[in-house]
Structure formats: structure tokens, C-alpha cells
Amino acid sequence: MPARKHTQWLKKPTVDYVDSRIYSDWDIFYEEQEKIFKKVWIPICHESEIPEVNDYRTAAIAEQNIVMVNLKEGVRAYENPNNLGVAGNLDDTTWLYDCTELHCEVKYGGLVWVTLDPNPTMDVEQWAAGAFDCIQSALDTEPLEVFHYHKGIIGSNYKLWHDTNSEFYHDFMHYFNRVTGFNEEYFARKNTGFPNGHVNVGSFEVNYEAFDGADRGALSFPTLPPNQWYMVDLFPGMNINLRGSALRTDIVTPLAPDKVMIEFRGFGLKKDTPEERAERIKHHNTIWGPFGRNLHEDLIGIAGQ
């Protein structure tokens, strides 16, 4: 590439381009909160986190505190004006009726979806636009249950995390991926785009024997062939990752242009025996847990971009 002087670097490109300020500009950050995060459906938690009547779970979307409550008539979501703890059980729910109720649905394996939009033009299924078709039977055949939760606050823009869940070039950083999956089938996977900005990544069979010498195929999800791997990447930054015996979800909450909170959950089947659950937890945590390997390599990758 020929050398450029200062004015040439500042000159607007003559081809399509993405301005790097999308990763650092506060005005763009606030605009994204208003025009994106306050408008979309977000799978904010799971019904198994609020299993009993009056159980609640708090969260935030676009700096708006919200609370999801398991009421007798079903799961409901409200703007949360109180200083509730992260989760618990409400002795009194009458104050909720003075709060603004938010649109809420339980869909796709028991995920609790919430939108701040008071007049959404689409329900969750319309919003997903077919992106879940590849794994819906695996999620809906049996009730699911959260067995793992941790979160990270990362010095990076949320869009970089979303990118790392949908492209393949960063996988060369991964030791586990190189030994279990770098084959022709891995790179033959197809990224399929859907309306509303969603993508899913086609499946292939992971060779876990190359990693830990163990055949993990005996334990899977309903209708899912052994050791298969599917990913659903939802706009603007949510990830549903079904890999063999465990399901992982990533829910992003942008905190600043250069800071994002990511909540990671691991799921098994509610009907799991103690032995099956222990095996799923082991499989999940080896790759994706807080002391695993793969997840940290992803996070290091986006923090360095």
C-alpha cells in the first residue's frame, strides 16, 4: 500500500466503509440504546430461575431497571422502581400493579423475553424470523434448567463480542477448537442470515476424543445428534450456543462504548439424573465455565481488538 499523508488519511473513503467510532463514540452509544436496545426483544433470563410463585429476577435493559416475576397467571415483567435484590421471593406483590408492565413472553426452551417497546410490531417468534428453527425441537421437547451462571465485565464494545460469536477467523486462537474441530467439515459450516439481523451457524460434529480422550456422544439434547454444534446469533448481541450435551446463552448489556457486561448461563434438562447433570456441568465448564479455556480465549480476543 502506498504511503499517505495526513490529509489523505482524513479524507472520506470512496468505497463503502464502517467508521471506527461505532466502537468508541458516546453519542453513538446513546443512540444505540434508544434506537436498538429499547426496541428489540431480549432473552433476559430463564423460567427455571423463578420456579416458584412470586419468585423474581431483576435485570436492566438500556439503563432501565426491570423485574421479572412468576405470578399465578404466568411470568410478567415490569419496570422496577424498588431496590430489590438480584433475585428472591416477594412477600407482597400488590405494588407491582403501580408499575409499568412490559411486554413479556416465555419462548424457545423457557427463555423469558422482554422488550421496552410499549408498542412492539412483532412478537418473539416474528422477531426471531426462523433463526431458531434449527434447534427449536431440541429446546422445546423437554423442559430446561439453568445449572450455571456467571458474568463478566469486559473492556470492549458489545459489537466485537457479537462478531466473535459469528465469524471463524478468531478460532485460530483456540487450543480446544484446533484439536477438536479444525477439519473440512468445520470450515464448510454455513452462516445463514435471517430478517432482523439474525444469523445461525450450521452444525458439524465435534471430535471431543481429540481433546480429552472421552466420547461425549452418549449425552445430548432431544432430537440433536451426538456432539453436534449449532449457534444462533441474535441481533443486536445475544448468542444461543448448543454444543453436544450443554446449552449456553450469552446476554450482553452495554455499559459504555468500551465496556460490556456479558451474562453466561449453562443449561441441562430438568429431568436429568444427578449423574447426567454432573456430566453436563463437567462438559460445559471444561469449555465455557469460569475456569475453562475456550471462553477466556474469546474474551482476550475482543479485549485486544
Go through the PLM ranges and name each one.
Residues 1-79, 104-105:
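N-terminal pre-ligand scaffold of iron-sulfur
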Residues 38-51, 83-88, 230-236:
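Short Pro/Gly-enriched beta-strand edge/turn motifs at strand-loop
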Residues 51, 67-73, 102-305:
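C-terminal catalytic domain of Rieske-type non-heme iron oxygenases
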Residues 72-105:
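Long, hydrophobic, well-ordered secondary-structure blocks that form the structural core
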